[in-house]
Regions:
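Long, low-complexity, compositionally biased intrinsically disordered regions
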Residues: 1-448
Length: 448
């Protein structure tokens, strides 16, 4: 059975019409913070309700999609996460296979209201809700309520009620990994609306089983099965069809690529909204199974650092690491490491357009988040069981032996990287993060 984290709310969230405008009110829950007197996160008007509905439908299509699971597994659908803060409302979700991540950012200019408090909650997108969203018109009066135990969409002639769903643990792990990739990604291509539509018309039919590349041919961008200079690699190209319903409404498209081609992100700009779609390297690889966060989590986090960070994050809702290296925060030298650690915990998302982290208040204790990764727990157990032995350590090179199941693994860490004789490293060569034996050796060295 899939592991889930269940939480509830003391008050409902509501999206309703007031003076001909939409007002969105999001309630909160947290197991680490006491409830406040604020009834919701955000109260205000949504200036583009039709576009919001179209984007939420596209996000829902991502959530109910899977590119490596059976129909029986697809019956276990889950629903998006919503964050409000820094004068923005963000909707996030993963495909069920966790290999596609989507986010809708509604920017300050697209909202007219008050942020009473920042926070994160969940919403429910089952079929009755999707059907109601699909029928929304520009001039229609719409009320959406997201409460403790139910979600309601109130239209002129009907009312849709959906029950809440638990939050998948897979999503917490995916939220952490994908932000690490986003923070390392760079803008590779910018396309106009016409260029984007021309490019997407050239998508191959059916499921694509080989890698494709986005290349420049003359002054046009094209998909090609042949790699060329400055091309970016796209695994599972057919997954981009999830963006097709939004293409008629965009102003432009920007494509961001990870330096090692571990992910690509396709960001659509639509007035005061941005919709981004991130693809994992391959269809069968979900972001939740990636090891991008393991090194950061393995270094540990001082609770005093977290307390100071939380104060700053809750006040500003955006993270500028320069703050921690300023005179007032000179005590913290590893600013990049701290940012990576917090992103690895799912507490930070990354905004590609602005090049900054935004704060996401996950409603779970640190110990629960840190306990989600089996490789990290496996590494800690190897240390507790005294199965790590340092053979030599000199001139920037460390060699260690780690006891496995009836075999001794050799771990070498030097200037050229990290290597292990285990099956995991032989199969993935470090592309999916370090194995538990490498993690154990690195943590053991930190403890010495």
């Amino acid at each position: 059975m899939e592991e889930t984290l269940t939480y509830s709310y003391n008050i409902p969230s509501v999206l309703q019409k007031a003076d001909g405008q939409d007002e969105l009110r999001l309630a909160k829950y947290s197991e680490i913070q006491k409830p406040s007197d604020a009834p919701c996160f955000f109260i205000g008007q949504v200036k583009q309700p039709f576009m919001m509905a179209r984007c939420l439908l596209a996000l829902a299509n991502v959530v109910k999609a899977s590119f490596n699971l059976s129909p029986a597994q697809l019956a276990l659908l889950k629903d998006p996460i919503v964050s409000a803060g820094y004068e923005r409302v963000r909707f996030e979700g993963f495909s069920h296979c966790a290999g596609v991540y989507a986010r809708l950012d509604i920017l300050p200019e697209g909202l007219n209201g008050d942020f009473l408090q920042s926070g994160t909650t969940n919403v429910d997108f089952n079929q009755p809700m999707l059907s109601a969203l699909a029928g929304i018109r520009n001039n229609e009066t719409v009320t959406l309520s997201v409460g403790q135990k139910a979600v309601g969409l109130h239209l002129e002639n009907q009312q849709i009620i959906e029950r809440k769903v638990p939050l998948p643990v897979k999503w917490i792990k995916g939220l952490s990994s994908v932000q690490v990739y986003l923070a390392q990604s760079e803008n590779s291509f910018t396309l106009s609306k016409i260029q984007a539509q021309q490019l997407f018309r050239s998508l191959p039919k059916g499921q694509v089983r080989t890698d494709y590349y986005l290349v420049m041919r003359g002054n046009m961008q094209q998909f090609s099965p042949v790699k060329s200079a400055s091309a970016i690699c796209i695994g599972g190209l057919h997954r981009l069809r999830l963006l097709e319903p939004l293409l008629p409404f965009i102003d432009k498209l920007q494509v961001f690529a990870h330096p090692q081609m571990q992910s690509t992100t396709w960001q659509l700009y639509m007035g005061e909204m941005r919709f981004s779609l991130s693809l994992s390297r391959d269809c069968w690889r979900g972001f939740s199974g990636e090891g991008a966060t393991l090194d950061a989590l393995n270094e540990g986090i001082d609770e005093g650092w977290l307390a100071i960070f939380n104060e700053q994050a809750q006040a500003n809702q955006t993270i500028n690491p320069a703050f921690f290296s300023s005179p007032g925060g000179a005590w913290l030298s590893k600013t990049d490491t701290l940012s990576a650690q917090l992103a690895a915990m799912g507490l930070l998302g990354f905004d590609l357009e602005e090049g900054t982290y935004f704060y996401r208040q996950l409603p779970f204790k640190l110990s629960r988040i840190l306990g989600l990764n089996p490789r990290l727990k496996g590494a800690e157990k190897l240390i507790v069981d005294e199965k790590v032995a340092i053979v030599s350590q000199q001139a920037g090179r460390t060699e260690a032996r780690v006891a496995g199941s009836g075999v001794q693994h050799t771990v070498i860490i030097d200037a050229s990287g990290e290597r292990c004789t285990c099956e995991w490293f032989s199969k993935y060569q470090g592309e999916r993060g370090p194995c538990k034996h490498v993690l154990a050796v690195k943590k053991y060295l930190l403890m010495k």
